Amino acid sequence: MAKTLGLHIIADLYGVNPDLIDREEDIRHLLENSVKAGELTKISSHFYQFNPHGATGVILLAESHISIHTWPEHKTATVDVFTCGDPSKAYRAMDYIINSLSPTHVDKKVFDRGIIEDSKGKDVLWIMSKAGCC
């Protein structure tokens, strides 16, 4: 099994109650609580309220980041959770967001990021460079 530097979960949430994703303060509260649920370490954050509706926000983590972008007029939110270290933290943070917003449909993808070793402990980048592909 490959060793990776991090886990990246992206999700498109459809059928979200627009009242839950329209205001900056609501998504701020949502992301702050997802950091707690994932037992992650917040470094800083930035949120922005769009006019007439919708908001966006990002929390910079010691482990990487969590972000959300909302379109209440389409009942849609896109969420991004990327962490290094314990992958269960990313899953817990994302699960908190999904459970809090109760979408009718979720399109979620999970990516291993920064593959650094193969199952035998060999450096993948070294192997790829010797093969002439990097």
Curated annotation (Swiss-Prot):
Modified residues (Pyruvic acid (Ser)): 64
E.C. designation(s): 4.1.1.50
GO molecular function: adenosylmethionine decarboxylase activity
Cofactor(s) for this UniProt protein: pyruvate
GO biological process, one term: spermidine biosynthetic process
Pathway(s) this gene product operates in, as recorded in its UniProt entry: Amine and polyamine biosynthesis; S-adenosylmethioninamine biosynthesis; S-adenosylmethioninamine from S-adenosyl-L-methionine: step 1/1
GO CC term, one of those recorded: cytosol
Reactions that this protein is recorded to catalyse: S-adenosyl-L-methionine + H(+) = S-adenosyl 3-(methylsulfanyl)propylamine + CO2
Family, similarity comment: Belongs to the prokaryotic AdoMetDC family. Type 1 subfamily.
Identification of the protein by name: S-adenosylmethionine decarboxylase proenzyme
Gene that specifies this protein: speH
